[in-house]
Protein backbone atom coordinates (compact mmCIF):
# COMPACT_ATOMS: atom_id res chain seq x y z
CA UNK A 1 0.00 0.00 0.00
CA UNK A 2 1.46 3.34 -1.07
CA UNK A 3 1.50 6.00 1.60
CA UNK A 4 0.44 9.52 0.66
CA UNK A 5 2.08 12.73 1.81
CA UNK A 6 0.66 16.24 2.06
CA UNK A 7 3.14 19.03 1.38
CA UNK A 8 2.34 22.48 2.77
CA UNK A 9 4.56 24.98 0.97
CA UNK A 10 4.89 28.69 1.71
CA UNK A 11 6.55 30.94 -0.87
CA UNK A 12 7.40 34.32 0.65
CA UNK A 13 9.11 37.64 -0.02
CA UNK A 14 10.38 40.15 2.51
CA UNK A 15 13.22 42.58 3.15
CA UNK A 16 14.05 40.44 6.20
CA UNK A 17 14.12 36.90 4.78
CA UNK A 18 15.91 35.32 7.76
CA UNK A 19 13.36 36.65 10.21
CA UNK A 20 10.39 35.29 8.30
CA UNK A 21 12.08 32.00 7.47
CA UNK A 22 12.38 31.42 11.22
CA UNK A 23 8.78 32.50 11.93
CA UNK A 24 7.37 30.24 9.21
CA UNK A 25 9.57 27.33 10.31
CA UNK A 26 8.53 27.70 13.95
CA UNK A 27 4.85 27.72 13.00
CA UNK A 28 5.29 24.49 11.05
CA UNK A 29 7.27 22.97 13.93
CA UNK A 30 4.43 23.85 16.29
CA UNK A 31 2.25 21.50 14.24
CA UNK A 32 4.48 18.57 15.11
CA UNK A 33 6.68 18.23 12.03
CA UNK A 34 10.32 17.44 12.75
CA UNK A 35 11.83 18.16 9.36
CA UNK A 36 11.42 20.97 6.83
CA UNK A 37 12.61 21.67 3.30
CA UNK A 38 13.92 25.22 2.92
CA UNK A 39 14.73 26.58 -0.53
CA UNK A 40 16.40 29.88 -1.33
CA UNK A 41 17.39 31.52 -4.64
CA UNK A 42 20.67 29.71 -5.32
CA UNK A 43 21.90 27.47 -8.07
CA UNK A 44 20.37 24.09 -7.42
CA UNK A 45 23.30 22.07 -8.82
CA UNK A 46 26.96 22.41 -9.75
CA UNK A 47 27.35 25.83 -11.43
CA UNK A 48 30.31 24.57 -13.48
CA UNK A 49 28.01 22.12 -15.24
CA UNK A 50 25.03 24.42 -15.58
CA UNK A 51 25.38 24.97 -19.31
CA UNK A 52 26.15 21.30 -19.96
CA UNK A 53 22.86 20.09 -18.52
CA UNK A 54 19.72 21.86 -19.61
CA UNK A 55 17.75 20.09 -16.86
CA UNK A 56 19.56 22.06 -14.19
CA UNK A 57 17.75 25.13 -12.98
CA UNK A 58 17.89 28.09 -10.63
CA UNK A 59 15.72 28.22 -7.53
CA UNK A 60 14.05 31.58 -7.94
CA UNK A 61 11.89 31.77 -4.80
CA UNK A 62 12.19 31.61 -1.04
CA UNK A 63 10.09 28.80 0.34
CA UNK A 64 9.57 26.57 3.36
CA UNK A 65 7.80 23.21 3.02
CA UNK A 66 6.44 20.92 5.72
CA UNK A 67 5.22 17.36 5.20
CA UNK A 68 2.31 15.59 6.85
CA UNK A 69 0.64 12.20 6.41
CA UNK A 70 -2.27 12.48 3.98
CA UNK A 71 -5.34 11.14 5.75
CA UNK A 72 -8.87 11.95 6.91
CA UNK A 73 -7.50 14.83 9.02
CA UNK A 74 -5.76 16.54 6.09
CA UNK A 75 -8.57 18.91 5.12
CA UNK A 76 -8.85 20.11 8.70
CA UNK A 77 -5.07 20.46 8.88
CA UNK A 78 -5.08 22.59 5.71
CA UNK A 79 -7.75 24.86 7.15
CA UNK A 80 -5.94 25.28 10.47
CA UNK A 81 -2.64 26.03 8.71
CA UNK A 82 -4.32 28.62 6.49
CA UNK A 83 -5.95 30.27 9.50
CA UNK A 84 -2.74 30.23 11.53
CA UNK A 85 -0.64 31.92 8.86
CA UNK A 86 -3.41 34.38 8.02
CA UNK A 87 -3.71 35.39 11.67
CA UNK A 88 0.06 35.77 11.97
CA UNK A 89 0.64 37.79 8.81
CA UNK A 90 -2.67 39.51 8.00
CA UNK A 91 -1.55 42.86 9.40
CA UNK A 92 2.16 42.44 8.69
CA UNK A 93 3.16 44.65 5.76
CA UNK A 94 6.74 43.34 5.76
CA UNK A 95 5.92 39.98 4.19
CA UNK A 96 4.05 38.76 1.13
CA UNK A 97 3.35 35.02 1.12
CA UNK A 98 1.40 32.29 -0.60
CA UNK A 99 0.48 28.95 0.98
CA UNK A 100 -0.19 25.99 -1.34
CA UNK A 101 -0.77 22.28 -0.77
CA UNK A 102 0.42 19.31 -2.83
CA UNK A 103 -0.16 15.57 -2.57
CA UNK A 104 2.47 12.93 -3.34
CA UNK A 105 3.16 9.22 -3.10
CA UNK A 106 5.57 8.83 -0.21
CA UNK A 107 7.88 6.40 -1.98
CA UNK A 108 8.24 8.71 -5.01
CA UNK A 109 9.93 11.30 -2.78
CA UNK A 110 11.74 9.02 -0.34
CA UNK A 111 15.12 9.17 -2.03
CA UNK A 112 15.10 12.91 -2.71
CA UNK A 113 14.45 13.59 0.99
CA UNK A 114 17.47 11.61 2.15
CA UNK A 115 19.99 14.27 1.19
CA UNK A 116 18.58 16.60 3.86
CA UNK A 117 19.12 14.20 6.77
CA UNK A 118 22.42 13.52 8.57
CA UNK A 119 23.78 11.74 11.63
CA UNK A 120 22.88 13.82 14.69
CA UNK A 121 24.14 13.57 18.27
CA UNK A 122 20.94 14.75 19.91
CA UNK A 123 21.81 14.24 23.59
CA UNK A 124 24.70 13.17 25.81
CA UNK A 125 24.14 9.51 24.90
CA UNK A 126 21.80 9.30 21.92
CA UNK A 127 22.94 9.47 18.32
CA UNK A 128 20.29 9.28 15.60
CA UNK A 129 21.61 7.81 12.36
CA UNK A 130 19.68 7.69 9.08
CA UNK A 131 20.11 4.19 7.70
CA UNK A 132 21.88 5.40 4.56
CA UNK A 133 24.60 7.30 6.48
CA UNK A 134 27.83 5.75 7.77
CA UNK A 135 28.80 6.28 11.40
CA UNK A 136 31.33 4.75 13.79
CA UNK A 137 29.78 4.40 17.24
CA UNK A 138 31.78 5.89 20.11
CA UNK A 139 32.02 4.53 23.64
CA UNK A 140 28.84 4.94 25.72
CA UNK A 141 26.81 6.19 22.75
CA UNK A 142 23.34 4.81 22.09
CA UNK A 143 22.64 4.74 18.36
CA UNK A 144 19.12 4.83 16.95
CA UNK A 145 18.80 3.77 13.31
CA UNK A 146 16.03 5.69 11.59
CA UNK A 147 14.49 5.72 8.15
CA UNK A 148 11.98 8.47 8.84
CA UNK A 149 10.52 9.14 5.42
CA UNK A 150 9.70 12.59 4.15
CA UNK A 151 7.09 13.36 6.82
CA UNK A 152 9.39 12.86 9.82
CA UNK A 153 12.79 14.19 10.76
CA UNK A 154 15.56 12.33 12.57
CA UNK A 155 15.26 13.73 16.07
CA UNK A 156 17.37 16.86 15.75
CA UNK A 157 14.46 19.22 16.37
CA UNK A 158 14.54 20.57 19.94
CA UNK A 159 11.23 18.93 20.91
CA UNK A 160 12.64 15.45 20.22
CA UNK A 161 16.16 16.03 21.51
CA UNK A 162 14.84 17.55 24.75
CA UNK A 163 12.71 14.50 25.41
CA UNK A 164 15.57 12.12 24.63
CA UNK A 165 17.69 14.06 27.13
CA UNK A 166 15.03 13.59 29.81
CA UNK A 167 14.67 9.90 28.94
CA UNK A 168 18.36 9.06 29.19
CA UNK A 169 18.41 10.45 32.75
CA UNK A 170 15.71 8.03 33.97
CA UNK A 171 15.89 4.38 34.98
CA UNK A 172 14.00 2.46 32.29
CA UNK A 173 15.16 -1.00 33.38
CA UNK A 174 12.21 -3.42 33.00
CA UNK A 175 9.76 -0.52 33.26
CA UNK A 176 6.46 -0.39 31.36
CA UNK A 177 6.46 2.53 28.94
CA UNK A 178 3.93 4.16 26.63
CA UNK A 179 4.69 6.66 23.87
CA UNK A 180 1.55 8.62 23.00
CA UNK A 181 1.59 9.91 19.42
CA UNK A 182 4.55 7.77 18.45
CA UNK A 183 5.11 9.14 14.93
CA UNK A 184 8.38 7.67 13.64
CA UNK A 185 8.67 5.44 16.72
CA UNK A 186 11.89 7.11 17.87
CA UNK A 187 10.82 7.35 21.53
CA UNK A 188 9.66 3.72 21.61
CA UNK A 189 13.06 2.71 20.24
CA UNK A 190 14.85 4.87 22.81
CA UNK A 191 12.83 3.25 25.59
CA UNK A 192 13.80 -0.25 24.47
CA UNK A 193 17.46 0.73 24.10
CA UNK A 194 17.36 2.08 27.67
CA UNK A 195 16.17 -1.31 28.91
CA UNK A 196 12.40 -0.94 29.18
CA UNK A 197 10.26 -4.05 29.51
CA UNK A 198 6.82 -3.52 28.01
CA UNK A 199 6.75 -0.72 25.44
CA UNK A 200 3.52 0.55 23.91
CA UNK A 201 3.08 3.14 21.18
CA UNK A 202 -0.17 4.78 20.14
CA UNK A 203 -1.06 7.02 17.22
CA UNK A 204 -4.24 7.96 15.39
CA UNK A 205 -2.56 7.73 11.99
CA UNK A 206 -2.00 4.59 9.90
CA UNK A 207 1.02 6.14 8.16
CA UNK A 208 2.75 6.60 11.51
CA UNK A 209 2.05 2.99 12.40
CA UNK A 210 3.83 1.77 9.27
CA UNK A 211 6.82 4.08 9.72
CA UNK A 212 7.18 3.11 13.39
CA UNK A 213 7.07 -0.61 12.54
CA UNK A 214 9.82 -0.22 9.96
CA UNK A 215 12.03 1.74 12.34
CA UNK A 216 11.55 -0.72 15.20
CA UNK A 217 12.67 -3.54 12.91
CA UNK A 218 15.69 -1.49 11.74
CA UNK A 219 16.78 -1.34 15.40
CA UNK A 220 16.43 -5.11 15.84
CA UNK A 221 13.33 -4.74 17.98
CA UNK A 222 10.83 -7.50 17.32
CA UNK A 223 7.25 -6.38 16.78
CA UNK A 224 6.35 -9.19 19.19
CA UNK A 225 8.20 -7.32 21.94
CA UNK A 226 6.22 -4.08 21.60
CA UNK A 227 2.61 -3.06 21.05
CA UNK A 228 1.61 -0.52 18.40
CA UNK A 229 -1.99 0.58 18.74
CA UNK A 230 -3.94 2.81 16.37
CA UNK A 231 -6.59 5.01 17.95
CA UNK A 232 -7.26 7.45 20.77
CA UNK A 233 -5.57 6.66 24.07
CA UNK A 234 -8.39 5.31 26.24
CA UNK A 235 -9.98 3.55 23.26
CA UNK A 236 -6.93 1.34 22.76
CA UNK A 237 -5.59 1.13 26.33
CA UNK A 238 -7.94 -0.61 28.75
CA UNK A 239 -7.13 -1.45 32.37
CA UNK A 240 -3.42 -0.91 31.84
CA UNK A 241 -1.12 1.37 33.83
CA UNK A 242 2.44 2.39 33.03
CA UNK A 243 5.61 3.28 34.92
CA UNK A 244 6.68 5.87 32.35
CA UNK A 245 4.63 7.98 29.93
CA UNK A 246 6.38 9.90 27.14
CA UNK A 247 4.67 12.28 24.76
CA UNK A 248 5.98 14.80 22.23
CA UNK A 249 2.87 16.64 21.00
CA UNK A 250 1.67 20.25 20.86
CA UNK A 251 0.82 21.83 24.20
CA UNK A 252 -2.89 22.26 23.43
CA UNK A 253 -3.17 18.53 22.78
CA UNK A 254 -1.14 17.67 25.88
CA UNK A 255 -3.57 19.66 28.02
CA UNK A 256 -6.50 17.65 26.64
CA UNK A 257 -4.64 14.34 26.89
CA UNK A 258 -3.91 14.81 30.59
CA UNK A 259 -7.55 14.02 31.39
CA UNK A 260 -6.92 10.58 29.87
CA UNK A 261 -3.31 10.10 30.93
CA UNK A 262 -4.28 10.29 34.61
CA UNK A 263 -6.07 6.94 34.23
CA UNK A 264 -3.00 5.06 33.00
CA UNK A 265 -0.59 6.12 35.76
CA UNK A 266 0.74 4.01 38.62
CA UNK A 267 1.35 5.41 42.08
CA UNK A 268 5.00 6.24 41.29
CA UNK A 269 4.71 6.91 37.56
CA UNK A 270 6.75 9.55 35.81
CA UNK A 271 5.55 11.58 32.82
CA UNK A 272 7.89 13.17 30.27
CA UNK A 273 6.38 15.81 27.97
CA UNK A 274 7.84 17.79 25.10
CA UNK A 275 6.47 19.84 22.21
CA UNK A 276 5.68 22.75 24.53
CA UNK A 277 6.28 26.26 23.26
CA UNK A 278 7.48 28.61 26.02
CA UNK A 279 4.25 30.63 26.09
CA UNK A 280 2.21 27.47 26.79
CA UNK A 281 4.39 26.05 29.56
CA UNK A 282 2.40 27.40 32.50
CA UNK A 283 -0.86 26.16 30.99
CA UNK A 284 0.52 22.62 30.67
CA UNK A 285 1.98 22.66 34.18
CA UNK A 286 -1.26 23.97 35.68
CA UNK A 287 -3.31 21.22 34.05
CA UNK A 288 -0.77 18.57 35.05
CA UNK A 289 -0.98 19.70 38.67
CA UNK A 290 -4.78 19.50 38.48
CA UNK A 291 -4.54 15.79 37.62
CA UNK A 292 -2.07 15.00 40.40
CA UNK A 293 1.36 15.59 38.87
CA UNK A 294 4.20 17.77 40.10
CA UNK A 295 7.13 19.25 38.21
CA UNK A 296 10.55 17.74 38.81
CA UNK A 297 12.51 19.41 36.02
CA UNK A 298 12.07 21.66 33.00
CA UNK A 299 14.54 21.56 30.11
CA UNK A 300 14.76 24.35 27.54
CA UNK A 301 16.11 24.77 24.03
CA UNK A 302 15.38 28.12 22.40
CA UNK A 303 11.61 28.64 22.70
CA UNK A 304 10.84 24.95 23.34
CA UNK A 305 10.32 23.27 26.71
CA UNK A 306 10.23 19.69 27.96
CA UNK A 307 8.98 18.75 31.43
CA UNK A 308 9.60 15.85 33.79
CA UNK A 309 6.57 15.23 36.03
CA UNK A 310 5.93 12.64 38.73
CA UNK A 311 2.84 11.63 40.67
CA UNK A 312 2.32 13.65 43.84
Curated annotation (Swiss-Prot):
The keyword S-adenosyl-L-methionine applies. It is found in: Cytoplasm. The gene is prmA. GO terms for cellular component: cytoplasm. Signal peptide: none annotated. GO terms for molecular function: protein methyltransferase activity; protein-lysine N-methyltransferase activity. S-adenosyl-L-methionine binds at residues 160, 181, 203, 248. Gene3D superfamilies: Vaccinia Virus protein VP39. This is Ribosomal protein L11 methyltransferase. Keywords: Cytoplasm, Methyltransferase, S-adenosyl-L-methionine, Transferase. It comes from the Bacteria. Its EC number is 2.1.1.-. One of its GO terms (biological process) is methylation.
Amino acid sequence: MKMKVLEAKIIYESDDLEKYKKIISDIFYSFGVTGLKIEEPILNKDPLNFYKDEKQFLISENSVSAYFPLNIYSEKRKKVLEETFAEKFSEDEDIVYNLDFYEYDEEDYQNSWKKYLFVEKVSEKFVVKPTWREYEKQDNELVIELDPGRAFGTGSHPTTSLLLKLMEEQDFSNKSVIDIGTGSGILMIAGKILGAGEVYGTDIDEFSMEVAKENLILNNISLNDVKLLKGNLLEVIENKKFDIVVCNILADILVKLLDEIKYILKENSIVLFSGIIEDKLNEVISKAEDVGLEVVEVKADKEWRAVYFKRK
